[in-house]
Amino acid sequence: MRSGGQDIQVLIDAVETDDTVPGGPVVLYRLLIEDPAKRTFQNACLPDARGRQLGLPLQKETGVDFTCTSGAEGKCILMGYRPWDDRADVPMQDLHAACVHMMCADYGGDDRPATRDGTLVDIYDRFGIQKPDSVDPLPFEAAWGKNGALCVAHTRIAENVTLDGLAKAYPKLRSSLGPEVCTEEAMRHHPAALLFNRSASTAP
């Protein structure tokens, strides 16, 4: 495996199956990477919400890579959005991409995360893989497509980015910002809207 332009050795130390993933079990691996200076191996992944330090292989355009369950890609897979699952009724690759953008609050789809670890987010989709929380629902935040947000009612962390900031950075979103124009009801009819989320509204 290559990292930072260097070849590093990866050791699969353990294997376990997560049977709680929507759509069926997913095999996870405990991955160890070599520290050449110390000639020792250390865990490649940070702990996820369940304290597990696990990962799994993920096919990308550049080849096979490993992703951790603590990262956005891994979290989205464990929510049931499997990019390798070629289904006629659900665009899984696009749904996984939308989920990664949503998880990071990457509104413009250009790998500029605007979230904060530990932020409570309610995630659901138009296909019923994930369903919205019906108890004390949070305010609607945004609708998401494969290339980022399609509309934003409020930003997740106002300290990181505001609606005005999004309007300046992403002209394509200017007419789709604010709770008056960005509603779940309206976006349910948008063909490119795959994923939706709610989060607590924060003041700048």
Task: Describe each PLM feature range.
Residues 3-204:
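Long, compositionally biased low-complexity segments
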